[in-house]
Amino acid sequence: MDETVYQIKAIIVLDNNGKRLCSCFYDPPGTPITPLTEKDKFEKLIFEKCKTSNCELEIIDNKVVIGSKQSDVWIFVVGNSLNSNELALLDVLNTLISLFKKACATDESIMITKKTFLENYALIRLYIDEIVSDGIIFEVDEETILNRVPIADNAAQSLNEAIEMAKEKAKGFGFGFL
């Protein structure tokens, strides 16, 4: 495994209680897939270690972790090893924060909150996928990413409205699980 290529082990977003809002774990080719129980344990370990500090830079479970608290949301970028390039991880974190703020912006605020994060989850996942793929950092230039993810606000709003309308129609047919 070439550690210079596979820099990222995970991107993790947690709420103020340490509950997962989003997590993307990356396992390089030829390595076993990390079991869900280990991912959960690692997320809890990160939160417990960082909840009393800003977690700008930590070594957790032999991995470099860089994180930031934004309102009621914690964002972490986890390096693949102790040899991970902290500056590359910081570039990824700063790009994530900037793009998340754009996605979560409202008329009143540009803060990333749990509510706005979840409302814009699909767009945020697209941003994450443009930045990192399979643990490889592909792009950290914000403008390039914004040009590649051409979802306008009204297009996303129309999609959300269509989903809500479909849920209402499904309820009319007795589908109570929606």
UniProtKB/Swiss-Prot annotation:
UniProt xrefs under Gene3D superfamilies: 3.30.450.60
Keyword list, A-Z: Cytoplasm, Cytoplasmic vesicle, ER-Golgi transport, Golgi apparatus, Membrane, Protein transport, Transport
Keyword presence, Transport: yes
Keyword tRNA-binding annotated: no
Superkingdom as given in the UniProt entry: Eukaryota
One Pfam family matching this protein: Clat_adaptor_s
GO biological process, one term: retrograde vesicle-mediated transport, Golgi to endoplasmic reticulum
Oligomer and partners: Oligomeric complex that consists of at least the alpha, beta, beta', gamma, delta, epsilon and zeta subunits.
Function of the protein: The coatomer is a cytosolic protein complex that binds to dilysine motifs and reversibly associates with Golgi non-clathrin-coated vesicles, which further mediate biosynthetic protein transport from the ER, via the Golgi up to the trans Golgi network. Coatomer complex is required for budding from Golgi membranes, and is essential for the retrograde Golgi-to-ER transport of dilysine-tagged proteins. The zeta subunit may be involved in regulating the coat assembly and, hence, the rate of biosynthetic protein transport due to its association-dissociation properties with the coatomer complex.
Protein name: Probable coatomer subunit zeta-B
Taxonomy of the source species: Eukaryota, Amoebozoa, Evosea, Eumycetozoa, Dictyostelia
